[in-house]
Amino acid sequence: PMPGCLVMSTYYITSGYAAELSVEQPFDYVIMDEASQAILPMFAASRKIGKRNLWVGDIHQLSPIVILNGNRIKICGYKHLNEGLKLLADNSTSPIYQLTKTYRFGQRAANYTGVFYNDSLVAKESPEYNELPSMCKILSIDGGPTLVLTDMPSGDSTPLFATCMASFIVANIINDNKDKEIAVLTCMKKTTRSLQMAITQKVGTRKNLLVDTVARVQGLTTDI
């Protein structure tokens, strides 16, 4: 580090730097963004290289994706290593602060998301979303989630009716407003590929349309 300079780095590079460091805490401040994606040793590395630390993250986000089998993690007791931020939040004596005002969505969405945060979230603004007339009976004008129930046979990661329904909804949204940013998220890669094929056949390839797994797009902000 150089006095008065800002250094930006990934967890991977920083952890390697900390492992080889002979002089402790060369930085005045270390800020870890997306700290929920850091395993426990990364927090130790952060403390080693910085005199003061600020960890910014959400313990309710998905923990880091690891190669080890889930059963092995459980048997070997590695869960706390993988959920570093949650472990520290539950046991650390350091001051912890939660931001309660959301700028991403309206109050209806904040109420649903707030279930994970003791109903503490408040929306800065609550606009009405009425620019999608063909979806007015499905999507709420106040924003927030909508649950559409459909048959999904157990073990079938590419259910035909659900795939057709998703592509139909996407097509209607684009017909109403072609500039809307849309994300279609799934859990399984096989489901993602099936949806990508069905939606592309329906509306073509678009820069403002993303079909991917939840694990790959944490923190993404879109219209729908």
PLM feature spans:
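Conserved helicase ATPase core
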Residues: 1-5, 76
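Conserved helicase motor core of SF1/SF2 NTP-dependent helicases
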Residues: 12-15, 23-224
